[in-house]
Swiss-Prot record:
One Pfam family matching this protein: BIR
UniProt protein name: Baculoviral IAP repeat-containing protein 5
Compartments in which it is found: Cytoplasm; Nucleus; Chromosome; Chromosome, Centromere
One Gene Ontology CC term in the entry: cytosol
Modified residues (N6-acetyllysine): 23, 90, 110, 112, 115
Modified sites of kind Phosphothreonine: 34, 48, 117
GO terms for biological process, alphabetical: apoptotic process; cell division; cellular response to ethanol; cellular response to stem cell factor stimulus; chromosome segregation; establishment of chromosome localization; G2/M transition of mitotic cell cycle; meiosis I
Length: 142
């Protein structure tokens, strides 16, 4: 089975697929945070208009931006997300047993749910604030 037959998120376990996301990465040579080293640390490149160097760990979903040429991706990842299980894997993904892989991916799925829940809570809180302000403004018109 080729890598393209894998679900897209499982393709991110393969370093070459993560490297591919760094097409427009600003640091390519003579620096520590090359696409290769970023991918080794579990990062994918997900730039935005305001954050052209935004990278996210595909596993713990930690987002980091503001990279400097001398930043070490693995050290930065450990510093900002010390509990990321991807950093503790000692084997290449191709060497994992099915059981090891599924256990690892279960943790990734939990991380994704936690990230999405946190984002929804922030979104809800912002909406709540906006609605409350509108209610207070309407009440002031009485």
């Amino acid at each position: 089975m080729g890598a393209t037959a894998l679900p897209p998120i499982w393709q991110m376990y393969l370093k070459d697929h993560r490297i591919y996301t760094f097409k427009n990465w600003p640091f390519l040579e003579d620096c520590s945070c090359t696409p290769e080293r970023m991918a080794e640390a579990g990062f994918i490149h997900c730039p935005t208009e305001n954050e052209p160097d935004l990278a996210q760990c595909f596993f713990c979903f930690k987002e980091l931006e503001g990279w400097e040429p001398d930043d070490n991706p693995i050290e930065e990842h450990r510093k900002h997300s010390p509990g990321c299980a991807f950093l503790t894997v000692k084997k290449q993904v191709e060497e994992l047993t099915v059981s090891e892989f599924l256990k690892l991916d279960k943790q990734r799925a939990k991380n994704k749910i936690a990230k999405e829940t946190n984002n929804k809570q922030k979104e809800f809180e912002e909406t709540r604030r906006t609605v409350r302000q509108s209610i207070e403004q309407l009440a002031a018109l009485r």
